[in-house]
């Protein structure tokens, strides 16, 4: 895919800064007025006007830097809408919110989704196995991600992507990192425009259709729910028709998911995670090491020494990994009756982190791993699996030799006279 010149989020932020100034505060106290819902959300006539100015400045900049006719952009965004609902959905949960791993897992690793996944695998086995051959990502993991994301296209979102991104780019909820998040979504809006321009080939109808495609409340699109920037960087033309279509082409979706994981460090033939030994003796160490940071800080050898892992998990020939392989402690809490969370701990490996890069959530990554296992994925080193195959083959060969030897040594009785 040919990339057009891009403008960085920082540059956009600086260029738009002139439009974000606010009026000086009044010298006298304002009259007490009833606060509307719009004002609570920061959406007043003044802020709406400022957001519109910022949006118009952005599309002018994108037009100039990428050679896209401004008329194309004005036509494509003429009917855009501000989505207050999206702001509510993307806002962080209240501080009293309790994470619930068991409930989260049950939404994905469940019979209906598994049945749909098995059908998807059967219908797309050739593409899945080809993607695995090229990238080293097991086909069950690829299928699990698409199943978790959209149930293979059944749930690709209920919002128009241009409305989502234009809302969050200029009116993100009031959070400490609001400015950084708005810059991120302005970059995604810019990437969407460039993506649709490349797809449209100067056809306004195609451009508009691309802008209007369904998305999640965060602006992710297609069967694998890629953000526009990820489509530009990681998506693949899996069916070879010269077009990347994550909405309608299953092969494109399959190869794109596999390529994303490969680029983000997937290690072919290696496991995703290990179960831990959670006892009264090891529990304090698990709590200490589970810092919530998606960084591989410890070696498997260290975790074995801490008593957190079984010794065989540091042995490639026993289904484990190299002792010096890096890992992290993953905490998966669920509420309990006594208000104290019950926490399940696993050890995440490099492949776990690759999935976290797809969606920055431990719950998500572990759900994908367990979903893939439900589809037949063997969460152990391929060296162990190959050793098992070789052993079975060797046992079979030895058995045949033994049978042949017995036949050879068997005395033939003379026929009766």
Model-derived regions, located:
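DNA breakage-rejoining catalytic core of tyrosine-based enzymes
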Residues: 184
